[in-house]
Regions:
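Proprotein-processing/basic-patch segments
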Residues: 3-68, 72-79, 83-89, 147-201
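Aromatic- and Gly/Pro-enriched, solvent-exposed loop/edge beta-strand patches characteristic
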Residues: 10, 94-163
Length: 201
């Protein structure tokens, strides 16, 4: 119903243990906010209608985020929205943010893109600012132990072409309601399963 939703913070932790998505690092996307801001930095390229997946460091590992496991009974994912703190190091970079949303099914993983891509279409400034936009995904049933996978990209901002030689920074993992509290909202109320504690007897 109205007002029911689940807010999933983009974290820099990797308690999920997932390594089979093809991404360089798969970070947690959970209901608990972080405590200290961290960043991902990505190099720009030249082009029109191009995208570059956000990286942990410039030229480094690509980043993705994944939810906990869906609880018994499952749910249907419908409308999502995002709030990501983004900036470019020079206004000549001509970048904005894009999200791609997927269903991750475990085993030999099946990763299904749920419509999109979903573009904010607002060029970044040169200081960290909250970019907010809607991801109206294809309504998709998630079964128990499925997960939501999120990838963020830079793309060329409207009416301009991305230019090479610059960087864009995503700030995330910060405390709630502070600069860098990047998050992904889903319309449904879902209590994702906690990750198993690794390394305890």
């Amino acid at each position: 119903g109205a007002g029911m939703a689940t807010k999933l913070f983009l974290r820099c932790t990797t308690a999920n243990g997932i390594t089979d998505t093809g991404d360089g690092v798969v970070q947690d996307m959970i209901t608990t906010a972080g405590s200290a801001a961290t960043t991902g930095v990505v190099n720009t390229i030249t082009g029109d209608n191009v995208q570059v997946q956000w990286t942990k460091t410039a030229g480094g590992l690509s980043m993705a985020w994944i939810s906990g496991r869906v609880p018994a009974g499952g749910f249907t994912l419908t409308t999502c929205d995002l709030d990501a703190w983004c900036q470019e190091n020079n206004m000549s970079a001509n970048c904005s943010v894009r999200a791609r949303v997927y269903r991750y099914q475990p085993g030999t993983p099946t990763i299904t893109e749920l419509g999109g891509p979903f573009d904010d279409d607002v060029e970044f400034g040169t200081s960290a600012a909250s970019m907010t936009w809607i991801a109206n995904v294809t309504d998709t049933a998630f079964a128990e132990n499925d997960r939501i996978l999120l990838r963020l990209f830079i793309e060329d901002a409207p009416a301009v072409n991305m230019a090479t030689g610059f960087t864009c920074t995503l700030t995330f993992n910060a405390a709630n309601a502070t600069t860098g509290d990047s998050f992904f909202n889903i319309a449904e109320t879902v209590s994702f399963k906690a990750e198993p504690i690794v390394g305890t007897p």
